[in-house]
C-alpha cells in the first residue's frame, strides 16, 4: 500500500503540474511577463519565467492529499516518528513560503541579492529550529559526531549553498530541472528503501511536478508560446527542498532511519555537479575581486557552449556526468573508507 500511495503522489503531481503550467503560460503572455534576453543569457525571444510558481502549491497539495488518504485507509504514521516528522515539515513549509514569496517578487519586479541572501539564511534557519541539523560526518576526514555549535551553522551554510547551487546553474534549458530530477529520483528511492514513506512521497511529489515543466522548458517553442522558465521562484524553492531531503537523509536519527557508514556521501552525491560548479565560480569571482552574487559566464554550461556544444548536447553531457557521480558513489560506498 505504501508503494501505491507513493506512486499516487507522483502521478497526482504530474497531472496537476501538466494542468497548471499551460494556464501560467496564458497569463504570462497576456500580461507580458517575460524573461528578456541579454548578453549573458543564451535563449532567444521573449519567454515567461513564472513556471516555478506551480512547484510549491502542486507539491503541497499532492503530499497533503495522499497523507490524508493514508489516514483515511488506516495506514497511519508511527507515533515515535511523528514526533520528528511534524516539526520538520511544518518548519519546511515556513521556509518554503519565505523563498516562494521572495522568488515571485524577484521574478516580477526584481529583488536585491543582499535581500535574497538574508531571506535564504532565514529560511535555512528553519531546519535547526525543527531539530534537523547535520550531527555526524560518518567518519569523513576522521570526524564522526558533531557538536550543535558546529553542526547547526554547518547546516545553515549547506542549505544556503545548495539553494544557490541550483539557482546559479539554472542557465540553459533543462539543466537545473534535469539535475533536480536526478537528485529527487535518487533521494526518493533511498527513502523508499528505508521505508521512510513521508519523505519518499515528498521527493516523488516534487519529481512529478518537475516532469511536465521539463517538457515545456526543453521541448516547448517560444514562437508557439509553449516554452517557459522556472525563474527564481522555482530554483530557490527547488534548492531548498533538495537541501531538506539531503540533510534529513544525512542526519543521524535512529527513530527515522538506521545509521550506516557513508550516508552523508550518498546523500550529497546527486548534488556534486551543481555544488562543485558554484564553488568553482565563487572562487573565480573572489580571485577576480568581483561580487559573489553578480552573474557572469563562468558556469559549467557556459564552458560547454563556448566549446561548441549546443544547449541540448551540453545538458545531456552535464546530466550524464551527474548520473556517473551518483552511480560511482553508490557502487563504491562499501569499498572505500571515508576516513
List the predicted regions and their residue ranges.
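A generic, lipid-embedded transmembrane alpha helix
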Residues: 48-68, 125-129
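Membrane-embedded alpha-helical core segments of multi-pass
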Residues: 94-101, 119-130, 154-164, 180-186
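Short aromatic-rich membrane-water interface segments that cap or initiate transmembrane helices
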Residues: 45-48, 81-90, 142-152, 264-267
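Transmembrane alpha-helix boundary signature
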Residues: 62-79, 100-111, 129-141, 250
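Hydrophobic alpha-helical hairpins/lids featuring a short glycine-rich hinge
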Residues: 80-82, 86-122, 127
